[in-house]
């Protein structure tokens, strides 16, 4: 793992629940003792379920020794010394093929970017275009919003056809925001206090769906509202359909996908849920059947 921030630590926690992933090395400019502390305690996801300690400069988790380094340049990471197959590039800095390729130079076989690429590095989203993966050594897993939107958009487009659509994401606070008003030169609104405001913001998530689902290219765009919640975001997708369908028919199509081809990726619920009910959710997208609404058989809002 390169970058042990919010995403890096959540990747680590998720990997601990799987038998087919072994974390062998972490690179971050933090010292090992502080990394152990940040892994152990998490305000959003609670205490780490297991043992965490530091021995001889290594992180030891559940008795397993993990190499810790503090290199600024990924080219110096010597991943081959610890047998790294895949690097989770979670710094948010190295989001191009040219910069991420330094991990390959350092001995890694593959790199997964944990955010949208800044160049033409291919993006892959579960439930959308995983079948298009052709062995590329550097890929992007896009953004959290794209992972929520793409599976839903695919089901709707495959079953009813999307003429055009607008997306709004009601988005939890992220690390780039300010606790109180502060300078944010590129995005003035983004510098306003995160806990006090609903902040309109831009998002490339809807356009990114056009990259992972080319048939929707140019048909979707969207914006975001940053809201004062610590985790879990909502996608509100409003679309015009080619093929007329009642809201009940749309629900049926999504439910069928959630139990079939998209099981484990796209969830479906008819419960009276709220955002905190999805803290730690394993599906990347969960359709809230009760929250959506149709104006008519060709115009519908999905949540």
From Swiss-Prot:
Keywords: Cytoplasm, Glycolysis, NAD, Nucleotide-binding, Oxidoreductase. It is found in: Cytoplasm. One of its GO terms (cellular component) is cytoplasm. One of its GO terms (biological process) is glucose metabolic process. It catalyses: D-glyceraldehyde 3-phosphate + phosphate + NAD(+) = (2R)-3-phospho-glyceroyl phosphate + NADH + H(+). Pfam families: Gp_dh_C, Gp_dh_N. It comes from the Bacteria. The keyword Ion transport does not apply. The record marks 171 as: Activates thiol group during catalysis. Catalyzes the oxidative phosphorylation of glyceraldehyde 3-phosphate (G3P) to 1,3-bisphosphoglycerate (BPG) using the cofactor NAD. The first reaction step involves the formation of a hemiacetal intermediate between G3P and a cysteine residue, and this hemiacetal intermediate is then oxidized to a thioester, with concomitant reduction of NAD to NADH. The reduced NADH is then exchanged with the second NAD, and the thioester is attacked by a nucleophilic inorganic phosphate to produce BPG. This is Glyceraldehyde-3-phosphate dehydrogenase. It comes from Klebsiella pneumoniae.
């Amino acid at each position: 793992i390169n970058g042990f921030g919010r995403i890096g630590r959540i990747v680590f926690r998720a990997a601990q629940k799987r038998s087919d992933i072994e974390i062998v090395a972490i690179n971050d400019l933090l010292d090992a003792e502080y990394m152990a502390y940040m892994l152990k305690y998490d305000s959003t996801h609670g205490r780490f379920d297991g043992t965490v300690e530091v021995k001889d400069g290594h992180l030891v988790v559940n008795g397993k020794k993990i190499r810790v380094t503090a290199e600024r340049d990924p080219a110096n990471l010597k991943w081959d010394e610890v047998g790294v197959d895949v690097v989770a590039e979670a710094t948010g800095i190295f989001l191009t093929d040219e910069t991420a390729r330094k991990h390959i130079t350092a001995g890694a076989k593959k790199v997964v970017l944990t955010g949208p690429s800044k160049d033409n590095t291919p993006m892959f989203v579960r439930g959308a275009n995983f079948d298009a993966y052709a062995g590329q050594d550097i890929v992007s897993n896009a953004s959290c919003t794209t992972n929520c939107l793409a599976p839903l958009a695919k089901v709707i487009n495959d079953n009813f056809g999307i003429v055009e659509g607008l997306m709004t994401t009601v988005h939890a606070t992220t690390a780039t925001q300010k606790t109180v008003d502060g300078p944010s030169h590129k995005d003035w609104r983004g510098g306003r206090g995160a806990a006090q405001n609903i902040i309109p913001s831009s998002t490339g998530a809807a356009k990114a769906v056009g990259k992972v689902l080319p048939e929707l290219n140019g048909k979707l765009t969207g914006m975001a509202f940053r809201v004062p919640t610590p985790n879990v975001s909502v996608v509100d997708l409003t679309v015009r359909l080619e093929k007329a369908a009642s809201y009940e028919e749309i629900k049926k199509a999504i439910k069928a996908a959630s139990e079939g081809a998209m099981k484990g990726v796209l969830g479906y619920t008819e419960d009276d849920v709220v955002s905190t009910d999805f803290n730690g959710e394993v599906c990347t997208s969960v359709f809230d059947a009760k929250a959506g609404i149709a104006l008519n058989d060709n115009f519908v809002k999905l949540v």
